[in-house]
């Protein structure tokens, strides 16, 4: 291909996106590339798309086992179930960072927030190991079907710890409602309320907010007690 050298970044991005999202068609891939600033003209995307034979029918590989619907029960004790999820935001210099939020469903206590530019499965396991050392081992973890959560690394760690790893059904965020509701508050009250200069700045403000959330903020679902008060009253 005469334009191969100039097209290489687009080729790499198309291969990666197509591998991550095998059900995506041309237009969804094109708009993702355009959003990322790699292409503007759809004709260029289409030419590369066809050259890579991505327009040919493919057998979709089943990535995850079937998920079983599980009612969102109210735990009777602490460490019955922890919910995990990611959020993200940007620093003032435009770099995007992620947060891994870990919540105890029993008293809605925010056990920890891991923050970095990248949080692969290995960091998820490191974070959980640290939290287990401090809080004890949960009976179950509830997550969505993100790549970090369906990784063999996390599954093996949970098996070693005797923890049941429960994935919600795809497209059913209400099955992880505790952390979903928390994420809404976390974004409104913290992420959207501040301009972050650095990861150190994010970590400082998040830890201050976490302490206030756990010790000062009353929760209607907890009879207007704070998470710590609710756990101490049990």
Which residues does each PLM region occupy?
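Charged DNA-binding/catalytic regions of mobile-element recombinases
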Residues: 1-234
């Amino acid at each position: 291909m005469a334009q191969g050298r100039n097209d290489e970044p687009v080729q790499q991005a198309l291969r990666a996106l197509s591998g991550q999202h095998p059900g995506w068609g041309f237009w969804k891939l094109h708009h993702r590339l355009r959003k990322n600033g790699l292409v503007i003209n759809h004709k260029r995307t289409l030419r590369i798309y066809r050259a890579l034979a991505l327009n040919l029918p493919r057998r979709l590989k089943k990535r995850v086992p079937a998920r079983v619907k599980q009612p969102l029960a109210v735990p009777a004790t602490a460490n019955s179930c922890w919910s995990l999820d990611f959020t993200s935001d940007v620093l003032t210099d435009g770099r995007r960072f992620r947060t891994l939020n870990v919540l105890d469903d029993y008293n809605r206590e925010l056990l920890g927030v891991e923050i970095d530019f990248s949080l692969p499965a290995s960091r998820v396991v490191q974070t959980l190991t640290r939290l287990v050392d401090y809080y004890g081992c949960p009976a179950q973890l509830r997550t969505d079907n993100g790549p970090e959560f369906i990784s063999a690394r996390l599954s093996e760690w949970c098996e070693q710890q005797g923890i049941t790893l429960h994935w919600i059904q795809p497209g059913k965020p209400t099955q992880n409602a505790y952390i979903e509701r928390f994420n809404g508050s976390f974004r409104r009250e913290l992420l959207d309320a501040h301009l972050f200069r650095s990861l150190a700045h994010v970590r400082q403000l998040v830890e201050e907010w976490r302490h206030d959330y756990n010790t000062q903020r009353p929760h209607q679902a907890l009879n207007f007690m704070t998470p710590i008060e609710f756990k101490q009253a049990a």
